[in-house]
A protein has these predicted regions:
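Active-site-adjacent mobile loop/cap segments within catalytic or ligand-binding domains
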Residues: 173
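Serine-hydrolase catalytic machinery in alpha/beta-hydrolase-like enzymes
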Residues: 1-51, 60-68
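Primarily recognizes the serine-hydrolase "nucleophile elbow" in alpha/beta-hydrolase
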Residues: 40-42, 47-96, 107
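The feature captures the conserved acid-bearing segment of alpha/beta-hydrolase catalytic domains
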Residues: 74-156, 161-168
Length: 173
């Protein structure tokens, strides 16, 4: 497999959050689409098997790709990111396999929703997952797994909720 790690304008991405004080103005969806085309042409990758992922602003950009250009990606993983409560994206409503990884102790991306450090408002992690479960036509009841706590002294635990793809839909984790 191949990994491409692009950097957005001014080290950030124009990621749909219209109320974020630090959002650049570039057309990052077009930039990433052109990057995928160039890499596919130059290195022979299968453009139908491209996945997007990112942390924080990069996670929000992955969400934007899924919303506005689902034909560019086969799925996405958003880390420390949630749906914008003040989105300027135009959503296609297409089903896109989704993975969200958020932590309840994150001081920048509030797991319970609300204002981020840059002033942008986001839905809670739970609301974001529910929105994608509905959008993707996933099964409403998840399979829940609690990961073994290998270090009980670190104060953290991991829970995985898997929403299977419904007929014609896509899964959400």
């Amino acid at each position: 497999f191949a990994v491409a790690a692009p950097m957005g304008e001014d080290s950030g991405w124009n990621d749909c959050r219209s109320d974020a004080s630090d959002n650049p103005s570039g057309d990052d969806v077009a930039f990433i689409g052109a990057m995928i085309d160039e890499i596919a042409a130059s290195y022979g990758i299968d453009a139908s098997r491209v996945f997007a992922t990112g942390l924080s602003n990069g996670g929000h950009m992955s969400i934007r790709l899924a919303e506005e250009a689902p034909d560019l990606i086969a799925g996405f993983a958003a880390v420390a990111a949630a749906d914008s409560a003040a989105s300027e994206c135009t959503s296609s409503q297409a089903s896109v396999p989704a993975l969200f990884m958020n932590g309840s102790g994150d001081g920048l991306m509030p797991c319970d929703g609300g204002a981020m450090a840059n002033g942008a408002m986001v839905f809670s992690s739970e609301e974001t997952v529910a929105r994608w479960v509905e959008r993707n036509g996933a099964v409403a009841e998840p399979t829940v797994e609690t990961v073994e706590d290998v270090d009980p002294d670190d104060g953290s635990t991991v829970m995985i909720s898997r929403y299977a793809a419904g007929p014609g839909g896509a899964p959400v984790v």
